[in-house]
Amino acid sequence: SYESAGESYHNIVAMVPGRDPSLEPILLGAHYDTCDSFPGADDNAAAVAIILDVAAEMAHVSRDRSVVFALFDAEEPPNFLSQSMGSIRFYQDQRLTGFHCALILDLVGHDLPVPGLEDLLFVMGMETDYGLGEVIKDCPAGPSIRVLPTLSRYVGDMSDHHVFRVNHVPYLFLSCGTWEHYHQPTDTPEKLNYGKIEAISRYLLAIASAISMKQLSGPFEGYDSTDIELDYIHSVIYPVMAQMGRPIRVNDRRDIDWFADMMMGYLGG
């Protein structure tokens, strides 16, 4: 618990201890507050449910590295990116501990409003360490979701990964982006895709387990992830765009920039 600007806030944190306390822990986190008094099924109850599910699974496995699970308060306006924001306060309180990697979830319960890409999950932040790109390549998402890794700068600091980015902690940010019910009273449970939520939970468990054993040697944002991004655009996006009668050619960073702008237009970004 903490106080800020005369208000009380509460982060909820648990840890599965590892065998080697000298190793920096990994962090799995999501905010649990909602915008205004809206239901917040997608924003952000779905992510909270995934964190709790993965925590239950990881609690039964012995590993060298500790795993911290954090549910953050005060992510939504008017606290967003302020000193009241739960993830910022959490990092400030724990900065001497250090973190091997942070995995942050937000808006992970809905289908993308793009025909043929409803099952897509964006994974941002692999550019922060070469080892994260290797983990993404080595951990298939499974048959129920498709993953599209991309740069964080295309969406900006829209969630709790912000404090880890500015402090040069390797991170991955998992999200399905915004949709028509974002920050609306219509963000209700019956609109969620529970099969997709379950698939994202399995994927998070896989990449968290892999990252816990992966050396992340840096430097922070010290490599070019263009080739990985192109591989996923070619395998995931090309077939769908061709079926829509809108074939595209994406071959370099300039093309990826164009593609990202196009996708943000589809998603209302």
Language-model features and meaning:
Residues 6-8, 34-127, 161:
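Acidic/histidine-rich catalytic neighborhood of metal-dependent amide-processing enzymes
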Residues 49-52, 56, 88, 134, ...:
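Solvent-exposed, polar/charged alpha-helical surfaces in well-ordered, non-transmembrane soluble domains
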Residues 5, 20, 43-46, 50, ...:
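Short, contiguous, pocket-lining structural segments
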Residues 80-89, 159-169, 228-239:
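Short, electropositive alpha-helical surface patch
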Residues 1-39:
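Soluble metallo-hydrolase cores and metallopeptidase-like ectodomains found primarily
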Residues 217-269:
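Acidic, Ser/Thr-rich low-complexity intrinsically disordered segments
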Residues 13-15, 25-29, 68-71, 100-106, ...:
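Structural recognition of the beta-strand scaffold that forms the well-ordered cores
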Residues 107-227:
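Active-site-adjacent substrate-binding region
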